[in-house]
């Protein structure tokens, strides 16, 4: 699958996504400036914590960018349906297009999405078959970055040695306490909310149930698959190390096809 940029024209989605971006850039700039770099310069910490924080920040932003700009599985205008699979397709009663079963018509985006999980305003995009793996990465790295930020906020006042060579006239240094309190508040909100979302997403994958199917009470009893198989289908590869890399393309990996009713 080629990496094509996909944008949704939705002012509310742009607003929600800008809030997420603000939280990311606030902590990615503030924590190194007030905590990591000054303590590294004075020899209180080694380079590893600094590198790890920047790496977590980079992976989080990469997953955010990829999840918001990757086509979630939009159906072509005139799909070519193989003869052997015609029984697994149906007509959408909103856009009058043929689509695979378990697809859903997104009223926000105005088109059908293959195996759509939900529309997420925080990434201004649908979460579907082709970008679900990126959404999972975003949730995972947001948890990592938020937790790391909370740990550093705590260490700044209760563990690290006092700094002696900082510029007290600098705005960020002068208002350090207030700025780090805001950082801590953001970290708590993000870590708590995303942890709950990540749990429900992983549970849905393991039970082969989308968020829309759960909300519509249209779930069916299906045999439980091994977790490795379920996750491999979402990420498009059996190589577990690749599950954590947003800098790649996904290729469909159908290990076990389950057909259900549509929503």
Curated annotation (Swiss-Prot):
Q: Kindly report every residue range on the membrane side named Extracellular.
A: 26-44, 153-181
Where do the catalytic residues lie? Answer: 120 (s-palmitoyl cysteine intermediate)
Which catalysed reactions does the entry list for this protein?
L-cysteinyl-[protein] + hexadecanoyl-CoA = S-hexadecanoyl-L-cysteinyl-[protein] + CoA
Matching InterPro entries, A to Z? Palmitoyltrfase_DHHC (IPR001594), PFA4/ZDH16/20/ERF2-like (IPR039859)
The answer to keyword Transferase applying to this record is yes
Q: Record's family?
A: Belongs to the DHHC palmitoyltransferase family.
Instruction: Give the protein's recorded name.
Output: Palmitoyltransferase ZDHHC21
């Amino acid at each position: 699958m080629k990496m094509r940029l996909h944008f949704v024209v939705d002012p509310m989605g742009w607003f929600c996504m800008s809030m997420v971006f603000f939280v990311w850039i606030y902590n990615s700039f503030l924590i190194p400036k007030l905590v990591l770099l000054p303590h590294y310069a004075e020899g209180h910490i080694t380079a590893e914590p600094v590198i790890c924080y920047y790496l977590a920040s980079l992976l989080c932003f990469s997953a955010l960018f990829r999840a918001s700009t990757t086509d979630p599985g939009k159906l072509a205008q005139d799909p070519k349906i193989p003869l052997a699979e015609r029984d697994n397709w149906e007509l959408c009663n909103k856009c009058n297009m043929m689509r695979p079963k378990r697809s859903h018509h997104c009223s926000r985006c105005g088109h059908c999405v293959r195996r759509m999980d939900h529309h997420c305003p925080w990434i201004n995009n649908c979460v579907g078959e082709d970008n679900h793996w990126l959404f999972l990465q975003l949730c995972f790295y947001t948890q990592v970055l938020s937790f790391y930020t909370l740990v550093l906020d705590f260490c700044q006042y209760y563990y690290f040695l006092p700094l002696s060579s900082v510029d007290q006239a600098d705005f960020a240094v002068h208002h350090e306490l207030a700025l780090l309190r805001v950082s801590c508040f953001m970290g708590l909100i993000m870590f708590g909310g995303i942890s709950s979302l990540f749990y429900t997403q992983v549970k849905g994958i393991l039970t082969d149930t989308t968020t829309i199917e759960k909300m519509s009470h249209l779930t069916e009893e299906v045999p439980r698959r091994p977790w490795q198989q379920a996750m491999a289908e979402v990420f498009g590869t059996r190589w577990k190390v690749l599950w954590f890399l947003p800098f790649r393309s996904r290729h469909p990996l159908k290990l076990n096809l389950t057909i259900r009713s549509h929503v």
